[in-house]
């Protein structure tokens, strides 16, 4: 559920509802304050809505399943093999691959889905127009875990701020509860946990869960968002480019695939497959 903690956030809820209708999500249900209190007694909110088709998954299990399907269809996972350079040629896209056994390979198809490194990979390949490659920025998100039994029955999201989703409640398949992520900029790919963020977490969470006790939060983990817009700029949607944008046949670049990239991964995969199929016609 998504909750507004005061009247000023009602416009945000209406915006979500309108976007859901545009995207074909037709099962959102607006909830009154009394209905919210019945569903989530620990949550204090002004209004909100329920998304009954939302669920949770084992993300690592999903990735292993993806890998198994890929390998069953002839793919290989090759780790520690960075793309160090390349060029667009008449025969295809030549990639210089580093690692323990450096090699040069010519590819008919390159799908650049390297997360934080996607703009870096594109810039390393001569022939990919620089004007089509976004800048890359680094933003870290911290997660804290809740000690003891979770008081929540659903995933709980506050109305988002301009550039991120806010500190929300996630419950995993084991019933464990975590809060996060927050949002702060970093100059490089730096996963260090900043314990000084703790006070801000308590403040943000208590806006909708005032029963949070001192000392109930424990440091969890961090994640880095592959941002393509910088500080002071409004967040943008995923950027997926094929030859109609950058002019390189056989290449699809995926930039800024942060949350909800995992949620969208199957749909993104189908879309990229369609782009490649259309390019080959």
Predicted regions: what they are:
Residues 8-11, 39-46, 87-94, 229-235, ...:
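A short, glycine/Asx- and small/polar-enriched loop/turn
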Residues 32-33, 79-81, 219:
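Short loop/edge segments at beta-strand edges and connector loops
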Residues 49-109, 266, 275:
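Helical element adjacent to the flavin cofactor pocket in flavoenzyme catalytic cores
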């Amino acid at each position: 559920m998504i909750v507004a903690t005061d009247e000023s956030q009602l416009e945000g809820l209406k915006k979500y509802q309108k976007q859901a209708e545009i995207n074909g999500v037709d099962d959102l249900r607006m909830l009154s304050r009394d209905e919210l209190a019945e569903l989530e007694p620990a949550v204090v909110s002004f209004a909100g809505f329920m998304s009954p088709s939302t669920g949770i998954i084992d993300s690592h299990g999903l990735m292993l399943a993806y890998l198994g399907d890929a390998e069953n269809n002839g793919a290989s996972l090759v780790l520690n093999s960075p793309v160090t350079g390349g060029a667009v040629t008449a025969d295809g896209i030549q990639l210089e691959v580093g690692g323990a056994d450096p090699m040069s390979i010519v590819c008919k198809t390159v799908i650049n889905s390297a997360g934080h490194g996607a703009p870096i990979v594109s810039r390393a390949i001569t022939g990919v127009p620089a004007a089509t490659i976004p800048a890359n920025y680094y933003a870290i998100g911290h997660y804290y875990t809740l000690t003891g039994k979770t008081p929540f029955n659903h995933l709980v999201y506050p109305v988002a701020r301009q550039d991120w989703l806010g500190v929300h409640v996630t419950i995993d398949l084991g019933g464990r509860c975590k809060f996060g992520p927050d949002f702060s900029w970093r100059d490089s790919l730096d996963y260090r946990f900043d314990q000084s963020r703790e006070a801000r977490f308590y403040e943000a969470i208590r806006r909708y869960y005032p029963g949070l006790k001192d000392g109930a939060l424990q440091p969890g983990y961090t994640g880095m968002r592959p941002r393509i817009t910088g500080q002071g700029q409004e967040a943008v949607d995923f950027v997926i480019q094929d030859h109609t944008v950058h002019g390189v046949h056989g290449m699809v670049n995926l930039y800024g695939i942060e949350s909800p990239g995992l949620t969208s991964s199957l749909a993104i995969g189908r879309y990229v497959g369609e782009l490649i199929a259309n390019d080959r016609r």
